[in-house]
Amino acid sequence: MMIEYVFGLAVRALLSNSEGKILILKRSTDSKTNPGKWELPGGKVDQGESFDKALIREVYEETNLKIELDNVVGVSQQNLPLIRAVHIIMSGKIEEGELNLSNEHEGYAWEFLDNFSDYELADWLEDFIKNRTAASQTDEDIEDKKTSENPLNPWIKNIGASVDRIRGKR
């Protein structure tokens, strides 16, 4: 019997500091989904809310940081009981604010993407990184000159592969 999923939409921010390290947050241990695991800041899009407004709101609620968004850099999927959540990941910049976590999270770290494997990641983020790695291995000869020096380049290269996977083409 095939499960009929309700689709949920979440947005996530890929925020890097001047060293190229990316902000990750540790979910509280009493969280319903991915308790105690690490993830990118962000959350659910409310009905009628734009991606940008939702992500700016979620990041502020979770971190007290005001951000400016750049581009969509990837997509991931999370299968929960009865809900299939699609996570749209956008790059952004911190504009102002002191990092102060809400009660949804109990820790944070600034970490290089290559070191994410040292953390117990939320399932959707772990899946996204695995797909990014696979896509970059098969597309090594593709070089985007515009982002070649950008620390977010590995994420940006994965957009097509992520979307294809969500659509079931890979």
Q: Can you describe what each PLM-predicted range is?
A:
Residues 17, 76-98:
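Active-site-adjacent beta-strand/loop module that shapes the phosphate/pyrophosphate-binding cleft
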Residues 100-132:
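NUDIX/MutT-family hydrolases
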Residues 21-61:
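Conserved Nudix-box catalytic region and its N-terminal flanking loop in Nudix hydrolases
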Residues 65-74:
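A short coil-to-beta-strand element that immediately follows conserved catalytic motifs
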Residues 3-7, 34-37, 82-86, 102-105:
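A generic structural micro-feature
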Residues 39, 66, 110:
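Short aromatic/basic micro-patch
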Residues 1-22, 75, 91:
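Conserved N-terminal beta-strand and adjoining loop/helix that marks the start
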Residues 136-158, 164-170:
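Short, low-complexity, charge-dense intrinsically disordered segments
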